[in-house]
Structures are given as C-alpha cells and as structure tokens.
Swiss-Prot record:
Belongs to the ner transcriptional regulatory family. Negative regulator of transcription starting from the Pe and Pc promoters of Mu. Also negatively regulates its own gene transcription. Residues 57-76 bind DNA. This is Mu-like prophage FluMu DNA-binding protein Ner. The lineage of its organism: Bacteria, Pseudomonadati, Pseudomonadota, Gammaproteobacteria, Pasteurellales. It comes from the Bacteria. Pfam families: HTH_35. GO terms for molecular function: DNA binding. InterPro entries: Lambda_DNA-bd_dom_sf, Ner_HTH_dom. Keywords: DNA-binding, Repressor, Transcription, Transcription regulation. Disulfide bonds: none annotated. The gene is nlp. SUPFAM superfamilies: lambda repressor-like DNA-binding domains.
Length: 89
C-alpha cells in the first residue's frame, strides 16, 4: 500500500472562534464580562481563542455549559498524545 492509498485519520476539530463567541453571547456573556466575573484581565481571557490556556478554557467552557474537551478537541488530543517509541538501530 502506498502513502497515497492510506486512509487519513480524522482529527477532531476545535470550534471556530466565532462559534465560541456566539455561544457565549447566547448564554448572556461577553468576553469582557466573563473576564470580570472570573477576575482575570480581558487580554488574558482573549488568548484562549488562539492559544492553549487550560484555566481560561475551563472558564469559557463553564460559561457555555460544554466541556472544554468538546470545544477544543484538537488541543486536548495534542495534550493527551503519547509519543511512539521507535528503535534507532
């Protein structure tokens, strides 16, 4: 079987940032109000949309009512990935 014939693994996708913001708004939150409630700065909370930040991920997920593993499935898959050991010789 060649490389082109191998089936690709389907990776879980993270939610799009607009979807996260829309869900927050549906639940009565803005990033600024959530940051104030969580006693963190707005800029700190905003970084969760682009970078991995477990504490802020939990804050956003709790406000939406969905586990962070669902919202950022790709990040959690990367965190929980075990390296495969290969013989060098």
């Amino acid at each position: 079987m060649s490389v082109l014939e191998k089936p690709k693994k389907t990776a879980e996708q993270d939610w799009h940032r607009a979807d996260i913001l829309a869900e927050l708004k549906k639940n009565g939150w803005s990033l600024r109000s959530l940051a104030k409630e969580g006693q963190v700065s707005y800029n700190t909370l905003k970084t969760v949309l682009d970078k991995s930040y477990p504490k802020m991920e939990r804050l956003v997920a709790n406000a939406i009512g969905v586990p962070p593993e669902v919202i950022w499935a790709g990040r959690f898959a990367e965190r929980n990935k075990r390296p495969t050991l290969q013989h060098k010789y």
